[in-house]
Amino acid sequence: MKTLLLTLVVVTIVCLDLGYTLKCHNTQLPFIYKTCPEGKNLCFKATLKKFPLKFPVKRGCADNCPKNSALLKYVCCSTDKCN
């Protein structure tokens, strides 16, 4: 019984992500992403303001949401692959 309990504990530890890491898209392609470094807790997506289609021109990880510029609108989120 103790062996079974120990096995379950080990399997649980191995399967759990002990240190949560955020995953963000980092290219214009939606199926490519990277794990963000420690301290970067937001994903962002930049789109062109004047372009009718909201195609992302830049994606990545950030510690703070970048400010909008004259050309780019930034949207930030904090869940895996949300950008």
UniProtKB/Swiss-Prot annotation:
Q: Which cysteines are joined by disulfide bonds?
A: 24-43, 36-61, 65-76, 77-82
A GO CC term? membrane
| One GO MF term attached to the UniProt entry | toxin activity
The record's annotation in Gene3D superfamilies points to: CD59
Q: Which UniProt keywords apply?
A: Cytolysis, Disulfide bond, Hemolysis, Membrane, Secreted, Signal, Target cell membrane, Target membrane, Toxin
- Into which family does the record put it? Belongs to the three-finger toxin family. Short-chain subfamily. Orphan group XV sub-subfamily.
Protein name (database record):
Cardiotoxin 7''
Which organism does this sequence originate in?
Answer: Naja atra (Chinese cobra)
